[in-house]
């Protein structure tokens, strides 16, 4: 117990841990609020109290009576919309139609008509009610249809099993049909109710919280395992017979306890924020009352389901915590810990998000730690897995697999902690390298600060491996071609047109367009002739017409896009712009691609988070920071030498990640269209002289400035934390996680601002990046050199 309390104090006494915890809570709350405070949710947020009152009112009525009253009110809003349309139109035919419809409403639905008249006299002040009435009517329709959904389950299974695909009684498909019907039959008499489920659903579906919790668990592991290793304290944990055993047990118990507390805390905060936004949810209703959980076969209330959701989060984070503990015990290198831990978790996330439900790899999707963390899907949906042609419910299988993983990680963590030397020692490859260097490499005795720092970064901290990997990645990625998938049938024909037309508008190209126009006019004329030809049979007419329609629906649509582009280019040419034909599909994605922009920048930030912390933290780790005072400006020169090393690393990483795509693009499509004005592709561009290559250069400059700011922020964190692993974790919270959140926002990227002429946003981003870089650089310089300054002042005094 004393060891447990000591380990707890060791974590809680660290100000950085508390700062990161509250920072994560604040960022998570802000991102949750931002994700809910959208234009689509505006009515729900504004009138949440009124919506709750309406639900209370209708839930007290029988469903049939409530449906009848709601239908009448919805009809009143429909009649009101006809009044509005009649008042706004001046078309005589529409006026006649609206007048006739209103007379029919007045005759057949006098109550609804009178209510619509009253609404019109008030000016439609309560139009928001229409939205909520429709929502409640959908809930009532769902409640009324649910018994039929359950009753027909067995009939559907019987009907499907009669087909040849499902007829084999020993197959998974056959067993799955009847197991599903039997499992749902237990819900036959489930009572459903109207409920305001907005806060409940928003809490269940918000998954970004898991990333924050994983980051905090990673930080806890740093304090429990890496901190003592870097301080060289593990050699002292042998003073009693069971010193290491008791120590690792205390560490693991504390890790699991803190992980569960943090996980519950985040879910509680999420539910509190959503309740504040949308109003409370009646947690006493059956979970099937919420239409999103129609497929849930658990006989639980909404409150009990919320507890199961929290339990799933805790179990999932237990498994991740045990795996992180094992990684921290096995590896002594901070970079290997970071890459192995987050790399494995990231791979699991990719499997869960990218593998389809019906894929032959779906076991990797569902026997997955993120399937557990997604508690709403884990407990809220019905899924049977194919285990040796048997239909087995996914929940016990997943629990069994990850329960085993948890036990194995925990047991091996205890064994390895007790048996292995936890002090950081040189590995076999490091020893072989030292022998090789002693025979074939002689030190030149250089006193250059830059050479010394570059040597420490590349050789001592093994970042030469990362640089080599980046160079290899750049070389390999430069080969190949760039291909854009066709989203429509006409895209291939449009590309064929652009391959011929691309470039300046010439008389030859204009004649070609005229020929194509005549060709499609003749096709239209031919369609009419076929329809009027009495000598052809109906089958022949249909076959010939279908053939022409296929041409018009693919090549014809593509040519319509060409004509639209041609007319727009002629208008631009009249304004004195050097208008050119260009493939809009290809170059729109080339200039502004949400996925490529954020993937490249997120990967660049990840590379920086792995490498940059080693530049400054090494001096604190080996205690050399106190010896760097041989001259008056020794620390200042050393500081800028380290900054130069960071900038070189940044430049290598940026070049390796960004340049290969442009090399492949030019190899595929050439460089002829790079000087085409951007306004030829995007109509919103205000600067008419801005070309494609200008947009690309601006994009790269902005991202390089952002990356520079990120580099200096990581440097500042490493100087304050004095630990490479702490820096990686905190930088992940400050940089990587916000990037994942920003990915969901379409207009929060440089490419979008460039093509929409948001010049102010671009300039402000550049200025803010430069300001952050300068401020963090000055703070880092002051912190790194403050010991020397105070010693000099004391000496002079």
Residue ranges and their predicted role:
Residues 1-4, 190, 432-450, 579-581:
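Short, membrane-interfacial amphipathic segments enriched in basic
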Residues 8-23, 334-336, 454-469, 725:
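Membrane-interface helix starts
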Residues 16, 243-244, 333-338, 634-635, ...:
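Membrane-helix interface segments
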Residues 17-20, 31, 316-324, 349, ...:
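Alpha-helical transmembrane segments of multi-pass membrane transporters/translocases
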Residues 22-24, 335-348, 467-474, 725-738:
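Central hydrophobic cores of alpha-helical transmembrane segments
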Residues 24-85, 153-228, 249-329, 383-384, ...:
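Secretory targeting signals
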Residues 221-236, 240, 244, 612-627, ...:
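Transmembrane helix boundary and interhelical loop/hinge segments in multi-pass membrane proteins
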Residues 279-286, 355-376, 430-437, 668-679, ...:
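Juxtamembrane non-transmembrane "cap" segments at the membrane-aqueous interface
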């Amino acid at each position: 117990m004393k060891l447990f309390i000591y380990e707890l104090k060791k974590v809680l006494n660290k100000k950085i841990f508390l700062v990161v915890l509250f920072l994560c809570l604040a960022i998570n709350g802000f991102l949750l609020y931002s994700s809910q405070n959208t234009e689509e949710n505006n009515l729900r947020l504004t009138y949440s109290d009124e919506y709750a009152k309406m639900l209370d009112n209708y839930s007290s009525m029988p469903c049939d009576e409530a449906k009848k009253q709601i239908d009448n009110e919805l009809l009143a809003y429909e009649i009101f919309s006809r009044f509005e349309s009649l008042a706004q139109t001046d078309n005589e035919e529409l006026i006649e139609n609206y007048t006739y419809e209103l007379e029919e409403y007045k005759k057949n639905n006098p109550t609804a008509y009178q209510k619509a008249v009253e609404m019109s006299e008030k000016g439609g002040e309560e139009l928001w009610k229409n939205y909520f009435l429709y929502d409640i009517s959908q809930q009532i329709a769902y409640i009324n249809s649910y018994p039929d959904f359950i009753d027909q389950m067995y009939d559907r299974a019987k009907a499907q099993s009669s087909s040849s695909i499902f007829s084999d009684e020993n197959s998974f498909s056959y067993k799955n049909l009847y197991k599903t019907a039997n499992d749902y039959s237990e819900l036959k008499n489930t009572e459903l109710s109207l409920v305001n489920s907005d806060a409940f659903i928003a809490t269940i579906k918000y998954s970004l919280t898991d990333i924050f919790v994983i980051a905090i668990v990673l930080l806890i592991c740093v304090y429990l395992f890496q901190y003592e290793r870097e301080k060289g304290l593990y050699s002292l944990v042998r003073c009693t017979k069971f010193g290491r055993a008791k120590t690792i047990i205390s560490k693991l118990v504390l890790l699991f306890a803190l992980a569960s507390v943090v996980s519950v805390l985040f879910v509680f905060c999420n539910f509190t924020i959503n309740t504040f936004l949308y109003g409370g949810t009646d947690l006493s209703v059956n979970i099937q009352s919420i239409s999103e959980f129609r497929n849930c076969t658990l006989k639980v209330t909404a409150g009990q389901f919320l507890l199961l959701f929290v339990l799933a989060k805790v179990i999932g984070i237990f498994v991740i915590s045990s795996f992180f503990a094992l990684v921290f015990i096995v590896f002594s290198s901070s970079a290997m810990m970071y890459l192995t831990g987050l790399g494995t978790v990231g791979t699991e996330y990719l499997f869960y998000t990218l593998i389809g439900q019906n894929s032959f790899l779906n076991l990797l999707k569902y026997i997955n730690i993120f399937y557990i963390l997604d508690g709403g899907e884990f407990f809220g949906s019905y899924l049977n897995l194919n285990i040796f042609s048997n239909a087995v419910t996914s929940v016990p299988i997943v629990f069994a697999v990850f329960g085993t993983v948890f036990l194995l990680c925990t047991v091996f963590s205890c064994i390895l902690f007790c048996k292995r030397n936890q002090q950081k020692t040189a590995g076999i490859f490091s020893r072989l390298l030292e022998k090789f260097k002693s025979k074939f490499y002689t030190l030149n005795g250089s006193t250059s600060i830059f050479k010394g720092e570059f040597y420490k970064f590349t050789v001592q901290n093994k970042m030469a491996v990362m640089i080599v990997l980046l160079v290899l990645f750049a070389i390999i990625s430069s080969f190949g071609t760039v291909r854009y998938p066709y989203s429509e049938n006409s895209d291939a024909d449009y590309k064929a047109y652009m391959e011929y037309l691309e470039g300046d508008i010439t008389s030859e190209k204009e004649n070609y367009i005229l020929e194509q126009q005549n060709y499609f006019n003749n096709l239209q004329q031919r369609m009419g002739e076929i329809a009027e030809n009495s000598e052809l049979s109906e089958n022949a007419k249909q076959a010939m017409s279908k053939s022409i329609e296929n041409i018009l629906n693919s090549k014809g649509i593509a040519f319509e896009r060409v004509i639209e582009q041609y007319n727009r280019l002629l208008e631009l040419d009249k304004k004195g712009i050097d208008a050119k034909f260009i493939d809009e599909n290809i170059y729109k994605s080339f200039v502004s691609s949400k996925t490529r922009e954020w993937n490249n920048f997120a990967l660049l930030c990840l590379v920086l988070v792995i490498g940059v912390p080693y530049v400054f933290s090494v001096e604190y780790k080996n205690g050399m920071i106190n010896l760097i005072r041989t001259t008056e400006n020794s620390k200042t020169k050393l500081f800028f030498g380290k900054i130069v090393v960071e900038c070189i690393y940044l430049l290598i990483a940026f070049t390796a990640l960004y340049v290969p795509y442009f090399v492949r693009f030019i190899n595929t499509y050439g460089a002829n269209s790079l000087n085409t004005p951007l306004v030829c592709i995007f109509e919103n561009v205000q600067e008419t002289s801005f070309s494609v290559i200008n947009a690309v250069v601006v994009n790269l400059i902005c991202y390089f400035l952002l990356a520079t700011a990120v580099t200096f922020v990581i440097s500042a964190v490493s100087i304050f934390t004095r630990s490479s692993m702490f820096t990686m974790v905190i930088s992940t919270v400050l940089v990587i996680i916000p990037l994942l959140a920003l990915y969901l926002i379409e207009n929060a990227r440089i490419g979008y601002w460039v093509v929409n002429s948001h010049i102010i946003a671009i300039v402000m981003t550049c200025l803010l990046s430069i300001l952050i870089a300068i401020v963090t650089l000055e703070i880092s310089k002051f912190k790194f050199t403050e010991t020397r300054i105070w010693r000099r002042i004391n000496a002079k005094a």
